[in-house]
Amino acid sequence: MSVVDEIKGRIEIMDLVSESVQLRRTGKNYIGFCPFHPNSRTPAFVVFPDSGTWRCFGQCNEGGDIFRFVMKKEGWDFSQALHVLAERAGVVLTPVTP
């Protein structure tokens, strides 16, 4: 199992996203207003807990996993998101040696 998969397995996307987005359940999924663009009329941001992904069907038309969510929300690159999410998940990152 890769480090990325281990982190994804330890962090529930609902826990992460619900820290900054108010979500309501709609069947198996959750819906709310996208945190990445102004919109207060039509909730177009959907979290799919079964696949650990999210998608905005509105203005930004983007989606991804927990890494992409944190990268977009914080303006970070993958390396920064990896370190923060690894710490949150309790996963120790070991440097790759050539």
PLM regions: where:
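N-terminal structured subdomain of primase-like DNA metabolism proteins
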Residues: 1-98
